[in-house]
Amino acid sequence: MSFAGATALGIRVEDGVVLAADKRMSYGGFILSRNFKKIFVINDRIGIAFAGLYGDMGGLVRIVEGQMRLASLETGKPATVRNVAKFLSSLLYSYKFFPFNVEAIVGGIDPGGEPKLYVLDPLGSIIEEDYVAAGTGATTAFGLLEHVYKRGMSLEEAKKAAVEALRASMARDAGTGDGIDVLVLPVSGKPSLETIKFRLVEG
């Protein structure tokens, strides 16, 4: 995703899932916006974080939201996190010859109360993990996440780790910056979306 700078990540723990993404919208070396949304809430249990080309994000989200509502009406059951990830995977793969230029992280809580986290590449390959990162700053974010992630960490600790990983990416990746959106999806309780606004200043 070198053409459009962005970093997104996700962490799964026993108490829930954290999704986070930076606020900068850039293309090449030019900053187009410092207040861009890259995290989308599909329903009160599931969210998607994106890195990549910005027009593609909105189009994909509208399709996924509509399909998940329709499926829930037809079956009478709420969508699972894997339902969303698998549908998005199929959608991305169906455009493999003219691919969407995005990487996606799908996370949330299944109806049975189990946290789930998936990462998808532009062609729809899908992997389930405990922590993931995508975008131009993913290498730096992974380095910090591998150091701080531990089984049994709390949801609050996961949130702090996500923020620190994105701050590290902002320090090294010119396409990542200008604040962080953090979506917390707890096993018990309502999701919360928080914006942390700051700009990295040296000295």
Swiss-Prot record:
<feature type="propeptide" description="Removed in mature form; by autocatalysis">
    <location>
        <begin position="1"/>
        <end position="6"/>
    </location>
</feature>
<protein>
    <recommendedName>
        <fullName>Proteasome subunit beta 1</fullName>
        <ecNumber>3.4.25.1</ecNumber>
    </recommendedName>
</protein>
<keyword id="KW-0068">Autocatalytic cleavage</keyword>
<dbReference type="InterPro" id="IPR016050">
    <property type="entry name" value="Proteasome_bsu_CS"/>
</dbReference>
<keyword id="KW-0865">Zymogen</keyword>
<dbReference type="InterPro" id="IPR019983">
    <property type="entry name" value="Pept_T1A_Psome_bsu_arc"/>
</dbReference>
<dbReference type="GO" id="GO:0019774">
    <property type="term" value="C:proteasome core complex, beta-subunit complex"/>
</dbReference>
<keyword id="KW-0963">Cytoplasm</keyword>
<dbReference type="GO" id="GO:0004298">
    <property type="term" value="F:threonine-type endopeptidase activity"/>
</dbReference>
<dbReference type="InterPro" id="IPR001353">
    <property type="entry name" value="Proteasome_sua/b"/>
</dbReference>
<keyword id="KW-0645">Protease</keyword>
<dbReference type="InterPro" id="IPR029055">
    <property type="entry name" value="Ntn_hydrolases_N"/>
</dbReference>
<keyword id="KW-0647">Proteasome</keyword>
<keyword id="KW-0888">Threonine protease</keyword>
<comment type="similarity">
    <text>Belongs to the peptidase T1B family.</text>
</comment>
<dbReference type="GO" id="GO:0005737">
    <property type="term" value="C:cytoplasm"/>
</dbReference>
<dbReference type="GO" id="GO:0010498">
    <property type="term" value="P:proteasomal protein catabolic process"/>
</dbReference>
<keyword id="KW-0378">Hydrolase</keyword>
<comment type="function">
    <text>Component of the proteasome core, a large protease complex with broad specificity involved in protein degradation.</text>
</comment>
<feature type="active site" description="Nucleophile">
    <location>
        <position position="7"/>
    </location>
</feature>
<dbReference type="Pfam" id="PF00227">
    <property type="entry name" value="Proteasome"/>
</dbReference>
<dbReference type="InterPro" id="IPR000243">
    <property type="entry name" value="Pept_T1A_subB"/>
</dbReference>
<dbReference type="InterPro" id="IPR023333">
    <property type="entry name" value="Proteasome_suB-type"/>
</dbReference>
<comment type="subunit">
    <text>The 20S proteasome core is composed of 14 alpha and 14 beta subunits that assemble into four stacked heptameric rings, resulting in a barrel-shaped structure. The two inner rings, each composed of seven catalytic beta subunits, are sandwiched by two outer rings, each composed of seven alpha subunits. The catalytic chamber with the active sites is on the inside of the barrel. Has a gated structure, the ends of the cylinder being occluded by the N-termini of the alpha-subunits. Is capped at one or both ends by the proteasome regulatory ATPase, PAN.</text>
</comment>
